Amino acid sequence: MIPNGYLMFEDENFIESSVAKLNALRKSGQFCDVRLQVCGHEMLAHRAVLACCSPYLFEIFNSDSDPHGISHVKFDDLNPEAVEVLLNYAYTAQLKADKELVKDVYSAAKKLKMDRVKQVCGDYLLSRMDVTSCISYRNFASCMGDSRLLNKVDAYIQEHLLQISEEEEFLKLPRLKLEVMLEDNVCLPSNGKLYTKVINWVQRSIWENGDSLEELMEEVQTLYYSADHKLLDGNLLDGQAEVFGSDDDHIQFVQKKPPRENGHKQISSSSTGCLSSPNATVQSPKHEWKIVASEKTSNNTYLCLAVLDGIFCVIFLHGRNSPQSSPTSTPKLSKSLSFEMQQDELIEKPMSPMQYARSGLGTAEMNGKLIAAGGYNREECLRTVECYNPHTDHWSFLAPMRTPRARFQMAVLMGQLYVVGGSNGHSDDLSCGEMYDSNIDDWIPVPELRTNRCNAGVCALNGKLYIVGGSDPYGQKGLKNCDVFDPVTKLWTSCAPLNIRRHQSAVCELGGYLYIIGGAESWNCLNTVERYNPENNTWTLIAPMNVARRGAGVAVLNGKLFVCGGFDGSHAISCVEMYDPTRNEWKMMGNMTSPRSNAGIATVGNTIYAVGGFDGNEFLNTVEVYNLESNEWSPYTKIFQF
């Protein structure tokens, strides 16, 4: 185009072509003028390219005494693989990192002041955060000094504290145990005021009484809460106890009181939550005091996550009436740790059933809750979606799906629920899919499959959604098809086909691989198992199950696969098998209490749940759970009595 006599031309491929060539030059070491030394690894690059991407490197290059020579930059605290990821990004604008490497990429981006990359990595970590990992994510965010990331993690912890309290990371945290004696007819104040007084007491114990935080955590501490709302030290109830005052007093005290120089031991909250040395790499800012989240778990029993003098820890607090009506003598503390939940505050009861009986449903864990969607009963395919809270043993409804659907599977991808394919009970198999947005409690259509698909397996792997196998339009034989959905491009593409046709198979992810288990080729049940490697796009047959089955469910627990129930060609079955990938072996486990075919199976926390299904006579709405320690299934649950 030549406006006003000037030639105007825009080459749409120039930038992409040029950056690809630049990256090739970097990898071959041509025209490079900077050497990065990263923990003994040497990397060559071009100063001009790196200076455009990294303000940190720009400052270094700009201060070079010889701007025309070779620059040398040394890093002893970065992961070489992470730096290589950032170099590729600098040359291609594409950020590609294995999930295990994202934290290191974040750290390197922070060092190099690549804020956009740091934010993208932080958002990725948040999308993968759950109740099992949020504590380590908080330690990481605190160590990095990222207030945005830290605030989002803290908000998640506040919402899911009770679920988090059952996880291994929580149990490893250092803990402060408090027994608060109450005068007659006196109740503890609200969480906020209560823990402000507790923090005040901890500070005074450390800086005025000379205690260390580690010493305070070694045994249960006895405090006394009087009728005039004063918190007294239970060990000094002879009238010499210090009264801990208002919030203003607390703030002034923190500002004015300098750290004591003494020989007391220090502790820190490591990434695993264990006690560690003062120079541990993961520690909150020194002298930070903060209540992160708290819950009243029962009458006068409180649970709290807090930062005490920079240490992320747990505070257990139990209030009980004192045998004395006034602090004239020290109350005696039971060695049974009565600050913890008492046995009579736990009740065992049959698990609440779903509102609807359903078979061929989709199930998944999301935010510590069990989601059960769709399915069919004797009358119809369902649109309804139910959500189970394990801590209250209560089912509630979420927004219904747009389309009635059964004989499908559901998966969580980047924090969102996806349902794909299935049958609506009236027409041919479905090609449509939906995504549940919890922010608006509604389902949003996703791009359709290229072919209709029923009885297929669905699973999330490496940030993408896979749909595997399924039945043909006539429902008479299985398929080998495998397709993958990219939530960024919104496109479905094909990947390597299965070795064996199969439908009604169980599908899940474990250790970076995708597993498809059992199913049927036509109507003959299979015991064969295939494993997909996304690195080389191949399916491999591995050890077969002991029992051929279709319509089974699968869940992951402690790094192993548990395949539950199904149909063996004659009957609905209750048997369960466990696969150990390190041994490539299957082992029979404890049976479910009821036969279940086409049931929903999912892991929530450290528990496997089985919901719904068909027992050979009835469509089920019942629930049962698996206890790994006892190798038993039970239709009962224990919940706190409020």
Curated annotation (Swiss-Prot):
Keyword Repeat in annotation: yes
GO CC field: Cul3-RING ubiquitin ligase complex; cytoplasm; cytoskeleton; cytosol; nucleoplasm; spliceosomal complex; transcription regulator complex
Gene Ontology MF annotations: ubiquitin-like ligase-substrate adaptor activity
Domain called BACK: residue spans: 132-350
Keywords: Cytoplasm, Cytoskeleton, Host-virus interaction, Kelch repeat, mRNA processing, mRNA splicing, Nucleus, Phosphoprotein, Repeat
Region (Disordered): 257-281
Consequence of changing residue 198 to M: Significant inhibition of interaction with AHR; partial decrease of AHR signaling induced by IVNS1ABP
Spans annotated as Sufficient for AHR interaction and signaling: 164-368
Residues with the Phosphoserine modification: 246, 277, 322, 336, 338
Presence of the UniProt keyword Ribosomal protein in the record: no
Role: Involved in many cell functions, including pre-mRNA splicing, the aryl hydrocarbon receptor (AHR) pathway, F-actin organization and protein ubiquitination. Plays a role in the dynamic organization of the actin skeleton as a stabilizer of actin filaments by association with F-actin through Kelch repeats. Protects cells from cell death induced by actin destabilization. Functions as modifier of the AHR/Aryl hydrocarbon receptor pathway increasing the concentration of AHR available to activate transcription. (Microbial infection) Involved in the alternative splicing of influenza A virus M1 mRNA through interaction with HNRNPK, thereby facilitating the generation of viral M2 protein. The BTB and Kelch domains are required for splicing activity. Promotes export of viral M mRNA and RNP via its interaction with mRNA export factor ALYREF.
Membership in a protein family: Belongs to the BTB-kelch protein family.
Name of this protein: Influenza virus NS1A-binding protein
Gene, per the UniProt record: IVNS1ABP
